[in-house]
């Protein structure tokens, strides 16, 4: 017994429970003679841990395990047993396997990754590099060795010759007459501005070449089909063989190397842009085989054009009814939209348009540098990547983000990033958003400051959730999701990485089923809130709850926080060889908890709940519940449930 420095309403310390299941010994535990051969579930609830000390360094965990002759080294999940049971899965991420081998190291592993993102949050290039690295691609490791394209710049007319080179690349060289017309259009743009834009254009050309090589084994017809329906393979009740084959054969490393280099040059352009002397009246437009290149004057502008390669708006309260940093076709592989100032509106009503920082078999980036902005779309937007990279980078302002699904930092076979730097923002969606990663995907949402509101709508219920028709399937706010097919044709695909990082402010989070740090089918989901008095409200598999080989963590460092979960498997809970963590490091917190919560493990699941400090209140929704460090088993699994 360890003395509690706080005045918790309920006192619990170091519970550990065992049950009898797991004929395949998937947990891979080495048993002593005094224990039964088949070990089942491990779940613990730890209080009184030193603040800001990683779990890997806390001796109390090791001490508790040793009371039953169970060491940290024995607490592993057998990759061989999983492979034997479910077959080989080429989509499983090394990042997932690292945590599978070291379940008790997971908080330290994830926190180190969070710290990297925070430290590099001002660099599009570095954040993008991190996401590709965690997907298993060690490329572009040293920025100083990345191509600069300086040798290709024609100092007297950089933009003119860069555009001419685009035509030459596509075997459509400009005629002398067209070259002369273009020359007259570019001459009034300051040369230093031309030079910086030209570097971005050369990086875009290199990206197109790399993109074509990355998908060289796929037929043009298959690529067009996959481009038109990027979510065809998302749901378990459907099967898209074309997308599966493209994903199996694609050279993602080559793709991401080129997109990181492009991000590097975009960073450089954004850094120098405020110092460039660009007249407010500057206006320019030119068509190219990769899309149009545009500069808009500092006034209120209505943007409706499509297939845009590069767009720079110098100011004004603008309205974008177009893709705004989303690539519109296979032949528009790169789309970059930069807005310098103004309170802007970005709105797309067509669900087939990739917009507001979306890259589908391409690279899409929207950068808004200042102003109170409004972003609205149906799907495939606001930092969405599918076989590509999509980035929305908002540097200042009180903003609102609204979408239905697959947005706000969502990646499926790709990378989606949304970063908002300042002020209080509102994020609204229904599903598969706000830090969502599907197979071979990484979705990241980062917010630096402000009292933010994150909503995964659970009031307008669609009635399609397999757990409860009264709630929506969310997979939002830090969710990793994979395709489970052991009950179907067998083509299971391990999930990706979903991460939401909020650094400051009193924030509010709400979702339905699966959210707020959740993982499913070898997916990893993380929600990290650094400071503020925050509120978390969810339904099922939330707040560090995972199912079916998933990994989930919700970590809150500071503040007096409120956690409310309605149904099973929440607040540091793992089901079916899953790992769930809820870690609150400081503050006087309130927990309202269902069954199998606050350190709950079921069917070989591992659940950990850690409250390090403060005067806390624990309210249980039912008596005799399997929570607060208890484990259980399912003798008769409900196999008709798709998600748990």
What are the residue ranges of the model-derived segments?
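Long, solvent-exposed N-terminal ectodomains/accessory regions
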Residues: 57-206
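Extracellular beta-strand scaffolds
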Residues: 299-302, 316-320, 326-327, 342-346, ...
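Hydrophobic "rung" positions of tandem beta-strand repeat architectures
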Residues: 294, 302-303, 311, 320, ...
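Well-ordered beta-strand segments characteristic of repetitive beta-sheet solenoids
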Residues: 292-296, 308-315, 329-341, 358-370, ...
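Bacterial N-terminal signal peptides that target proteins for export
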Residues: 32-40
């Amino acid at each position: 017994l360890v003395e509690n420095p706080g005045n918790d309403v309920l006192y619990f310390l170091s519970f550990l429970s065992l049950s009898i299941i797991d004929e395949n010994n998937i947990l891979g535990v080495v048993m002593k003679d005094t224990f039964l051969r088949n070990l089942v579930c491990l779940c613990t609830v730890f209080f009184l841990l030193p603040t800001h000390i990683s779990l890997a360094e806390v001796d109390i965990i090791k001490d508790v395990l040793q009371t039953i002759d169970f060491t940290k080294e024995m607490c592993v999940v057998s990759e061989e047993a999983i492979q034997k049971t479910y077959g080989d899965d080429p989509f499983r991420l090394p990042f997932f396997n690292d945590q599978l081998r070291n379940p008790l190291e997971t908080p330290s592993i994830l926190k180190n990754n969070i710290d990297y993102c925070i430290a590099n949050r001002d660099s599009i290039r570095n954040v993008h590099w991190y996401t590709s690295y965690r997907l298993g691609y060690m490329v572009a490791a040293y920025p100083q060795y990345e191509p600069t394209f300086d040798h290709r710049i024609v100092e007297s007319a950089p933009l003119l010759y860069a555009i001419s080179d685009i035509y030459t690349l596509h075997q459509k060289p400009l005629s002398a007459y067209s070259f002369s017309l273009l020359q007259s259009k570019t001459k009034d743009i300051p040369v230093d501005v031309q030079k910086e834009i030209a570097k971005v254009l050369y990086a875009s050309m290199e990206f197109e070449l790399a993109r074509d090589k990355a998908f060289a084994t796929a037929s043009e017809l298959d690529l067009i089909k996959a481009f038109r329906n990027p979510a065809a393979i998302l749901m378990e009740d459907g099967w898209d063989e074309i997308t599966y084959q493209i994903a199996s054969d694609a050279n993602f490393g080559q793709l991401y190397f080129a997109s990181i280099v492009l991000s590097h040059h975009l960073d450089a352009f954004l850094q120098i842009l405020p110092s460039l002397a660009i007249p407010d009246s500057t206006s320019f437009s030119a068509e190219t085989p990769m899309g149009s290149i545009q500069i808009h004057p500092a006034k209120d502008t209505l943007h409706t054009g499509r297939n845009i390669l590069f767009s720079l708006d110098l100011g004004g309260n603008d309205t974008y009814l177009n893709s705004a940093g989303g690539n519109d076709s296979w032949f528009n592989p790169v789309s970059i939209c930069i807005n310098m100032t103004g309170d802007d509106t970005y709105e797309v009503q067509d669900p087939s348009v990739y917009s507001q920082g979306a890259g589908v078999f391409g690279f899409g980036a929207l950068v808004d540098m200042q102003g109170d902005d409004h972003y609205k779309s149906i799907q495939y937007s606001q930092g969405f990547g599918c076989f590509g990279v999509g980035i929305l980078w908002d540097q200042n302002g009180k903003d609102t983000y609204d979408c239905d699904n697959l947005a706000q930092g969502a990646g499926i076979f790709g990378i989606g990033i949304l970063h908002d730097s300042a002020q209080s923002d509102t994020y609204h969606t229904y599903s598969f958003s706000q830090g969502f990663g599907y197979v071979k995907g990484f979705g990241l949402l980062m917010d630096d400051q402000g009292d933010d509101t994150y909503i995964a709508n659970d009031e307008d219920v669609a009635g399609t959730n397999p757990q409860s028709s009264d709630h929506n399937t969310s997979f939002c706010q830090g969710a990793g999701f994979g395709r489970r097919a052991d009950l179907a044709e067998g083509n299971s695909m391990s999930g990706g990485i979903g991460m939401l990082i909020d650094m400051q402010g009193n924030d509010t989070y709400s979702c339905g089923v699966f959210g707020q740090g959740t993982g499913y089918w070898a997916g990893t989901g993380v929600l990290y809130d650094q400071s503020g008095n925050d509120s978390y409200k969810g339904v099922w598999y939330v707040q560090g709850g995972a199912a079916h080989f998933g990994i989930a963590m919700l970590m809150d460092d500071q503040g007096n926080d409120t956690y409310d979960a309605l149904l099973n498997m929440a607040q540091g809970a793992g089901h079916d060889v899953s790992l769930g963590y809820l870690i609150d490091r400081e503050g006087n917190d309130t927990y309202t908890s269902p069954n199998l919560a606050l350190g709950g493990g079921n069917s070989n699941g591992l659940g950990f709940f850690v409250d390090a400090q403060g005067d806390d209140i624990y309210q249980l929704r039912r008596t005799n519940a399997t929570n607060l460090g208890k484990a259980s088993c399912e003798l008769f699994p409900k196999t008709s449930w798709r998600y748990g």
